A protein has these predicted regions:
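Extreme N-terminal segment that seeds HTH/winged-HTH DNA-binding domains in transcriptional regulators
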Residues: 1-35, 41, 81, 85-93, ...
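Solvent-exposed beta-strand sheet faces enriched in polar/charged residues
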Residues: 4-6, 69, 77
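Contiguous, function-dense segments enriched for cysteine-driven chemistry
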Residues: 12, 20, 44-47, 61, ...
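N-terminal helix-turn-helix
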Residues: 35-67
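Minor-groove-contacting beta-hairpin "wing" of winged helix-turn-helix DNA-binding domains
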Residues: 38, 72-78
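General helical structural elements
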Residues: 44-45, 58-59, 75, 91, ...
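N-terminal helix-turn-helix/winged-helix DNA-binding helices
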Residues: 69-73, 86
């Protein structure tokens, strides 16, 4: 698994790890059922605190993208369909982003084109 962790980035390292794994899932680099490195191993590999990796893994689990079991570790799991809670969270996240974009002067067409660009890249 290949992640880019930039210590000087304004994006927290846990978020960078989370987002890198999400990108790997979306791109198909990380497959359903594939184990992730242990928290300790990933922390050593990238020179970060294990608590930082744990935070990223916990968020992935909350997102429904991984499951963690004592014996098998953390494994990629892609839900077949989003839950009602996930759909509502998506709606809330998008609402906040769309409102901010509208307040900044973006037009609806610009916002839709940006969403299209982002999703086409990963489909």
């Amino acid at each position: 698994m290949y992640l880019i962790v930039e210590p000087d980035s304004p994006v927290p390292i846990a978020q960078q790890i989370h987002d890198g794994i999400v990108a790997g899932i979306i791109s198909g680099e990380l497959q359903d059922g594939q184990p992730l490195p242990s928290v300790r191993r990933l922390a050593v590999e990238y020179g970060v605190n294990p608590a930082t990796v744990k935070k990223a893994y916990d968020q992935l689990q909350e997102d429904g993208l991984v499951i963690t079991a004592a014996r098998s570790g953390t494994v990629i799991t892609r839900p077949k369909r989003p839950s009602a809670q996930q759909r509502e969270q998506l709606r809330e996240d998008l609402r906040a982003t769309v409102w901010r974009a509208l307040a900044q002067g973006f037009k609806t067409d610009d916002i839709c084109a940006t969403v299209d660009d982002l999703t086409v890249k990963w489909e």
